[in-house]
Amino acid sequence: MKHIVKILSLLVAISAFWIGLLQAAIIPRSHTWLLPIYFVVSLGCYGLLMVGVGLMQFPTCPQEAVLLQKDIAEAKDFFKHKGVDVGSN
């Protein structure tokens, strides 16, 4: 619940800032109307950056890979006993 309140308060603050810019005419009106679009595009770029950084720092887990291979072999044996063709590998 606290996270939702943070997000909503941030959105209200950004909206108030945007409306203030529209009313004050500090920035030309044609540029001010585009600020929400810039914000959404920037947020998308930030999200893609965070996904990319997460993928670059993704840890390798050799122990988990061995366990996964054991699970795969166990599943193949199980299905072979049930009469299912699981391939030659």
Swiss-Prot record:
Covalent S-S links between cysteines: none
Subunit structure: Component of the dolichol-phosphate mannose (DPM) synthase complex composed of DPMS1, DPMS2 and DPMS3; in the complex interacts directly with DPMS1 and DPMS2.
Pathway: Protein modification; protein glycosylation
Disruption phenotype: No visible phenotype under normal growth conditions.
Predominant cellular place of this UniProt entry's protein: endoplasmic reticulum
Location of the protein in the cell: Endoplasmic reticulum membrane
Any one GO cellular component localisation term in the record: endoplasmic reticulum membrane
GO biological process: protein glycosylation
Organism lineage string: Eukaryota, Viridiplantae, Streptophyta, Embryophyta, Tracheophyta
Keyword Transmembrane: yes
Mode of membrane association: Multi-pass membrane protein
Protein name: Dolichol-phosphate mannose synthase subunit 3
Family membership: Belongs to the DPM3 family.
InterPro entries: DPM3
Originating species: Arabidopsis thaliana (Mouse-ear cress)
Regions crossing the membrane: 7-27, 33-53
Keyword line: Endoplasmic reticulum, Membrane, Transmembrane, Transmembrane helix
Presence of keyword Methyltransferase: no
Function comment: Regulates the biosynthesis of dolichol phosphate-mannose. Regulatory subunit of the dolichol-phosphate mannose (DPM) synthase complex; essential for the ER localization and stable expression of DPMS1.
Top-rank taxon, per record: Eukaryota
